[in-house]
């Protein structure tokens, strides 16, 4: 792989899990093992290195054998704070982010995002599902150049927290994925039960 195409994968597990009763979503069992481990297993073949962003239970996550970093910005500042942390600790030119509650994520996620990023010479590539009225950006499934770190730092320092507001200031390549189910987030305990016997796409 060319050096300028090397990718680090970041699993975002730094949220409060409020819709799941304020539990750590990445550690909730799904088909016999923590959701975060399912995510790591599907992301690992697609990247050179792996990182986890978490703000609680750091020792538990570290036991999985992957480097774990809490937000550099205090106060559970959202997914941009996780991206910021990942960029700070990324040793490759590119960083891909995925949430810890997405055990069905596509096995071609990085390849498709990479192709669009390179073709459009974009700052970021973001997954999109659906068409027309059902079109839905998936902003936490993103591939970013590490060069955007100073820009993101300035945005966060100015109080910015909304992902779409920051993306609007950058050149973003949107990449359509046909399999909407692959981007399913498990946000509640009911969904955890409902989808616990669903097999991910190969």
Task: Put a short name on every predicted segment.
Residues 2-160, 165-182, 189-194, 200:
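Nucleotide and nucleotide-moiety/phosphate-recognizing core
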């Amino acid at each position: 792989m060319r050096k300028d195409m090397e990718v680090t994968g970041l699993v975002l597990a730094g949220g409060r899990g409020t819709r799941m009763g304020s539990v750590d979503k990445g550690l909730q069992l799904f088909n016999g093992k923590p959701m975060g481990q399912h995510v790591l297993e599907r992301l690992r073949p697609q990247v050179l290195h792996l990182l986890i962003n978490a703000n609680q239970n750091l020792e538990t996550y570290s036991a999985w054998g992957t480097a774990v970093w809490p937000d550099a910005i205090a106060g559970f500042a959202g997914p941009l704070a996780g991206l910021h942390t990942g960029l700070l600790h990324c040793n490759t030119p590119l960083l891909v982010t995925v949430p810890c509650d997405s055990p069905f994520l596509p096995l071609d996620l990085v390849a498709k995002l990479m192709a669009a990023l390179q073709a459009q010479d974009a700052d970021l590539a973001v997954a999109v599902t659906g068409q027309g009225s059902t079109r839905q950006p998936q902003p936490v499934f993103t591939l970013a150049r590490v060069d955007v770190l100073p820009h993101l730092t300035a945005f966060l320092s100015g109080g910015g927290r909304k992902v779409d507001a920051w993306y609007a200031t950058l050149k973003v390549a949107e990449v359509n994925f046909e399999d909407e189910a692959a981007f399913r987030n498990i946000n509640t305990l009911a969904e955890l039960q409902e989808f616990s016997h669903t097999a991910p796409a190969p």
